[in-house]
């Protein structure tokens, strides 16, 4: 039995995973569950500005999450937190809506904002977008499975949801299931405990499209990997589409069974890298237009130059600037944006380490010219520092393996993997090398902070 306070806290945990920290802190952190009137879930916001923004931007999103948690369809209403209305909190019994085969219909699991029309295409995600669209148009015929990997907040989940929406819109009665690998694991464990493994298998092996997020969390879970292996085989054999996301390619997921890794590589593997400046500006423009905001170009350029880590933080920064403008009752300018973002920009910028910066730091330490990192020379005095630079590029940046290979003279991504594995092994026993890398990283971060 859950009170609405419990349900709201569970809702906030899901919201937090789908929003940047600045966005969450600005809009959601201070909200509370106020009351339940009939079928209306009432949420209290700290002021009328936040209330209006949430009402315009997040009503459906919150309703979807509430349905996923409770199995009930709620109307969602936001009120100003200053209102002094008191209602008795209601207890809700979860009762998930199932179709005739016992499979959750799945539409409520998809974020309505995550569709292809709202996805901003750039050089870092163009291939992943094209592959996702091809899969949506021809499930199980284009690429199966489709494996998308990349850093946090770069659009992997957006593309997965977009495929789900597209399939449901264009194929009657299509069963689409979206979930994280953590949820798959938790439900599997519960099914064993409650002696309901057959119901669990029916639920996940009778869908047309399975979208599973953050597959890397299956690492080390042998029982869950076994179950997912058979689920994968059943869906694949029945020509059902499987889309998987991860923060790294299959080869780099530790303690993942070889048979699963092999199956993940049957289809197409594509990565998403951080957006370049032009794409970041385009993302901000699209966000501003969608939310009906009039943001000067100089402000968008300023934000795009300061926030270059991922899309969630970029959009969160824009929201923070808008909220700050309203609260202090000042026009939105680049100066106001700098003031609004002063708490998050220093930590963000100080962490920006580039491959070229790593090459400079390693080259200076080992007396290797920058051009030698990209040359074909294999002498130990050059090859070993090059491997160290590749290792650090993998450890300290969000760049993909192909991107790192390109920065080192167009080398294949397998060369990067080999370099990373070699240095990783040496670091376990070689104290001198460990000290060298610590000194290089110290010099690198010092140079970044000076910049």
Swiss-Prot record:
Residues 1-72 are annotated as: Domain I, interacts with DnaA modulators. Plays an essential role in the initiation and regulation of chromosomal replication. ATP-DnaA binds to the origin of replication (oriC) to initiate formation of the DNA replication initiation complex once per cell cycle. Binds the DnaA box (a 9 base pair repeat at the origin) and separates the double-stranded (ds)DNA. Forms a right-handed helical filament on oriC DNA; dsDNA binds to the exterior of the filament while single-stranded (ss)DNA is stabiized in the filament's interior. The gene is dnaA. ATP binds at residues 153, 155-157. Belongs to the DnaA family. Residues 72-108 are annotated as: Domain II. NCBIfam families: DnaA, PRK14086.1. It comes from Listeria monocytogenes serotype 4b (strain CLIP80459). Pfam families: Bac_DnaA (PF00308), Bac_DnaA_C (PF08299), DnaA_N (PF11638). Domain I is involved in oligomerization and binding regulators, domain II is flexibile and of varying length in different bacteria, domain III forms the AAA+ region, while domain IV binds dsDNA. Oligomerizes as a right-handed, spiral filament on DNA at oriC. This is Chromosomal replication initiator protein DnaA. One of its GO terms (cellular component) is plasma membrane. One of its GO terms (biological process) is regulation of DNA replication. Residues 109-325 are annotated as: Domain III, AAA+ region. Keywords: ATP-binding, Cytoplasm, DNA replication, DNA-binding, Lipid-binding, Nucleotide-binding. Residues 326-451 are annotated as: Domain IV, binds dsDNA. The keyword Cytoplasm applies. GO terms for molecular function: ATP binding; ATP hydrolysis activity; DNA replication origin binding; lipid binding. It is found in: Cytoplasm.
């Amino acid at each position: 039995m859950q009170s609405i306070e419990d349900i709201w806290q569970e809702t906030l945990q899901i919201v937090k995973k789908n929003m940047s920290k600045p966005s969450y802190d600005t809009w959601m952190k201070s909200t509370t569950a106020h009351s339940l009137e009939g079928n209306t879930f009432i949420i209290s916001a700290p002021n009328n500005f936040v209330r209006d923004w949430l009402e315009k931007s997040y009503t459906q999103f919150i309703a979807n999450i509430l349905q996923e948690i409770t199995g009930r369809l709620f109307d969602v209403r936001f009120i100003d937190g200053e209102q002094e209305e008191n209602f008795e909190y209601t207890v809700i019994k979860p009762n998930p809506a199932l179709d005739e085969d016992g499979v959750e219909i799945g539409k409520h699991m998809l974020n309505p904002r995550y569709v292809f029309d709202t996805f901003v295409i750039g050089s870092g995600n163009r291939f992943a977008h094209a592959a996702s669209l091809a899969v949506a148009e021809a499930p199980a015929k284009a690429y199966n499975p489709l494996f998308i990997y990349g850093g946090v907040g770069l659009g992997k989940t957006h593309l997965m949801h977009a495929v789900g929406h597209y399939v449901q819109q264009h194929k009657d009665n299509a069963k689409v299931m979206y979930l994280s690998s953590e949820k798959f694991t938790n439900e599997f464990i519960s099914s064993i405990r409650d002696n309901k493994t057959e119901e669990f298998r029916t639920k996940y092996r009778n869908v047309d499209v399975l979208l599973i997020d953050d597959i890397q969390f299956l690492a080390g879970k042998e029982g869950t990997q076994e179950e997912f292996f058979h689920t994968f085989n059943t869906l694949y054999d029945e020509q059902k589409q499987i889309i998987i996301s991860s923060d790294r390619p299959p080869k780099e997921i530790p303690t993942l069974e070889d048979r699963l890794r092999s199956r993940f590589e049957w289809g197409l593997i594509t990565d998403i890298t951080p957006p370049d400046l032009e794409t970041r500006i385009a993302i901000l423009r699209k966000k501003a237009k969608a939310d009906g905001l009039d943001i000067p170009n100089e402000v968008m350029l300023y934000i795009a130059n300061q926030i270059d880590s991922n899309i969630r933080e970029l959009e969160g920064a824009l929201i923070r600037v808008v909220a700050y403008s309203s609260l202090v009752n000042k026009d939105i300018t680049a100066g106001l944006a700098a003031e609004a973002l002063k708490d998050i920009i220093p930590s963000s910028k100080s962490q920006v380490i580039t491959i070229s910066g790593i090459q400079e730091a390693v080259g200076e330490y080992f007396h290797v010219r920058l051009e030698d990192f990209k040359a074909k020379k294999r002498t130990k005095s050059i090859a070993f520092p090059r491997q160290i630079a590749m290792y650090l590029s993998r450890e300290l940046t969000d760049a993909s393996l192909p991107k790192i290979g390109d920065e080192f003279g167009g080398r294949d991504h397998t060369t990067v993997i080999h370099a990373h594995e070699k240095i990783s092994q040496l670091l376990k026993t070689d104290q001198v090398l460990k000290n060298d890398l610590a000194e290089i990283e110290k010099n690198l971060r010092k140079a970044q902070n000076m910049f």
